[in-house]
């Protein structure tokens, strides 16, 4: 029987149960009983807090992509709109099917109108993507590629096809919003501002890590390890961007740091799930590294 995907708190519980079983700390019967009730177990965090935590994550990503005070406020408002659409989609199959396109259209419209009014600085797309980052299928892309590498062709191809379709729908929503608002082409240039200095990436990592811990109801004791891998990922990504700006070197180094960092944590703390400390890094890498920002800029950039 296929059920909903496991939350990270459930993944952590599975890893802990496996470790305790292999270490003879718990009998098989107790481990089996724990695993059987795991999928139906309620989250430790109320649903409304889990939903609002996405706004925190979006603001954290904004601090990395477009660190400006006004941009932070507008991205937070757009993310709140996306969260509202996510809640609606739980009761509407049509909305759920078209959610990436609808959410991208709504968020992009809000940000472009704010940019047209002169409320935010820098490239508008860099303020759009943090608001819709929660819908970008970074985990699916990683899992699909991993399955293809492991010769699991059917599962890997299916995941990649679904992830690419999600990205295409998000891109179409952005393009429609641009056609509707028809902003000044200069607002669509990939220009980054930096009004907060070194505090921006530090605070961004904390907000992303804390928001994901709330949303996935992860044990708070795992937060330091999640923040460590996130900080390592961001540092490697920044160094790569400084070394080779305008290329994928920063993304490659960031992804490598996330993989290596999570493996090191798993060795140091075998009771912790490597997946739990690894996946949050995708919210750092995904918005500007999956091609969505680049493709949208190519489609919309002024001649």
Predicted regions and their residues:
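Membrane-interface helix termini and inter-helical loops of multi-pass transporters
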Residues: 118-123, 181-196, 300-302
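Soluble N-terminal domains of membrane-associated systems
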Residues: 1-39
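Core alpha-helical transmembrane segments of integral membrane proteins
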Residues: 44-144, 149, 215-216, 220
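Hydrophobic alpha-helical segments embedded in the membrane of multi-pass proteins
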Residues: 52-56, 76-84, 105, 202-208, ...
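C-terminal transmembrane helix-loop-helix hairpin of multi-pass membrane proteins
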Residues: 127-131, 143-146, 151-167, 194-201, ...
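Alpha-helical transmembrane segments of multi-pass integral membrane proteins
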Residues: 165-178, 200-212
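Short juxtamembrane and helix-loop transition motifs at transmembrane-helix boundaries
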Residues: 29-42, 56-67, 84-95, 180-193, ...
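Alpha-helical transmembrane segments of polytopic integral membrane proteins
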Residues: 58, 82, 86, 107, ...
């Amino acid at each position: 029987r296929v059920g909903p995907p496991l939350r990270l708190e459930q993944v952590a519980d599975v890893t802990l149960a496996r470790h305790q079983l292999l270490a003879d700390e718990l009998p098989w019967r107790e481990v089996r009983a724990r695993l059987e009730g795991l999928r139906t177990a309620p989250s430790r965090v109320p649903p409304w807090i889990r939903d609002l935590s996405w706004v925190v994550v979006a603001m954290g990503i904004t601090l990395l992509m477009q660190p400006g005070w006004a941009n932070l406020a507008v991205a937070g408002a757009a993310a709140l709109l996306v969260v509202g659409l996510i809640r609606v989609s739980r009761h509407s199959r049509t909305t759920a099917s078209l959610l990436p396109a609808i959410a991208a259209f709504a968020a992009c419209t809000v940000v472009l109108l704010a940019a047209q009014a002169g409320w935010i600085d820098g490239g508008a797309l860099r303020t759009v993507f943090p608001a819709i980052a929660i819908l970008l299928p970074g985990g699916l892309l990683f899992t699909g590629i991993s399955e293809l590498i492991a010769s699991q062709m059917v599962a890997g191809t299916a995941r990649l096809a679904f992830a690419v379709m999600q990205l295409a729908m998000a891109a179409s929503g952005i393009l429609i919003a641009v056609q509707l608002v028809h902003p000044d082409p200069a607002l669509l240039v990939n220009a980054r501002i930096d009004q907060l200095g070194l505090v921006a990436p530090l605070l961004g990592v904390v907000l992303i890590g804390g928001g994901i811990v709330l949303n996935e109801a992860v044990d708070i004791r795992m937060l330091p390890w999640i923040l460590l891998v996130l900080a390592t990922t961001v540092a490697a990504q920044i160094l790569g961007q400084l070394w080779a700006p305008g290329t994928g070197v920063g993304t490659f180094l960031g992804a490598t740091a996330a993989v290596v960092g999570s493996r090191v944590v798993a060795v140091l703390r075998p009771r912790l799930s490597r997946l739990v400390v690894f996946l949050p890094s995708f919210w750092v890498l995904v918005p500007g590294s999956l091609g969505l920002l680049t493709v949208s800029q190519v489609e919309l950039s002024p001649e």
